[in-house]
Design a protein with these regions (language model features):
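NTP-dependent nucleotidyl-transfer catalytic core
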Residues: 1-150, 154-158, 164-170, 183
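Conserved nucleotide- and phosphate/pyrophosphate-binding catalytic cores
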Residues: 163-311
């Protein structure tokens, strides 16, 4: 969904599953909704705000570059096939396969019936089903993977392909990762943690992961790292015996940051944390301070400036 120019930590679990599938011999293809992104997946309560075509195109190019660099996946844009479909062809070739009662029975649609849902959002399901059909026919895609909130859209695609071609295809969903309170995992103080290091520094990622809840860290090691079962069990033992050392937390931060940005960025984040928490401020460069606190939070003052002047 190209609503931003970078992926965030909330996306990471599904991408890592696709990475595991790739290592097992499969060929993952990331679909970016350059077409559907201009409409928006129905939300449980309100309609999503539209974003401009120019912004969608910019976001697509940024996401494509990021995914190719980090994960090595092929990236496609569904606007490439939607731009050639007119409304008559859409209704004749695809709409006829969708029963309105079937669509109304989808959970996300049912929850919006009382408050109202536009036809734009209502038709989103058909477009996602069409995506699966196109990729199946043109790219040989037989399995669609997504978060569990996309189950209804995936099954719509499976049904469309079966009805129109007789082919059997499959869906694979994964639960959304949450913290111990059931809140979506991957935000710090309400803000997204971006995978683009110019938007979220490696230091901020490090601080986030070394401070995850003790009760959840082993589960996160299983989801977000490629450590072996035996290695994770060893970290679990260490965490139980000496939780104050936070070895499992540090391993989580190390594995994720090294995977995303490389060993050098991880070591830099550890070094910055050491300087900050051991009061070694004199050794920090201006760029180090900007990474620690964000350049927008840094102000230059003169030696004789008072607090009143600053305020």
């Amino acid at each position: 969904d190209p609503t931003a120019d970078s992926l965030h930590v909330g996306h990471l679990s599904s991408f890592l599953i696709s990475k595991r599938l790739k290592e097992a011999g499969h060929h993952p293809i990331l679909l970016v909704g350059g077409g559907t992104g201009m409409i928006g997946d129905p939300r449980p309560t309100t309609e999503r705000a539209m974003i401009s075509k120019e912004q969608v195109r910019h976001n697509f190019e940024c996401l494509k570059k990021q995914v190719e660099e980090i994960f090595g996946f092929e990236v496609v844009n569904n606007n490439d096939w939607y731009q050639d479909i007119n409304v008559i062809d859409f209704l004749r070739d695809y709409g006829k396969f969708f029963n309105v009662n079937y669509m109304l029975d989808k959970d996300i649609i049912r929850r919006r019936l009382d408050s109202g849902i536009t036809y734009t959002e209502f038709s989103y399901m058909i477009l996602q089903a069409l995506d699966f059909k196109h990729l199946h026919e043109c790219n040989g895609v037989d399995l669609q993977c997504a978060g569990s909130d996309q189950w209804g859209n995936i099954t719509a695609g499976i049904d469309l392909i079966r009805k129109s071609t007789g082919d059997e295809v499959y869906g694979f969903t994964m639960p959304l990762v949450t913290d111990s309170q059931g809140k979506k995992f991957g935000k710090s103080e309400g803000n997204a943690l971006w995978l683009d290091k110019t938007k979220t520094s490696s230091y901020k990622l490090y601080q986030f992961f070394v401070n995850v809840e003790d009760s959840m860290v082993i589960n996160y090691l299983k989801i977000y790292t490629f450590l072996s079962k035996e290695e994770i069990e060893e970290y679990e033992r260490k965490n139980n015996e000496h939780p104050e050392l936070r070895e499992a937390h540090k391993a989580l931060a190390r594995e994720i940051i090294t995977f995303l940005h490389g060993k050098e960025e991880y070591e830099k984040a550890v070094n910055l944390a050491d300087h900050l928490f051991n009061n070694k401020f004199n050794d920090l460069s201006k760029s180090d301070i900007e990474e620690l606190f964000g350049s927008e939070d840094i102000k230059e003052v003169t030696p004789n400036q008072t607090i009143v002047d600053m305020l």
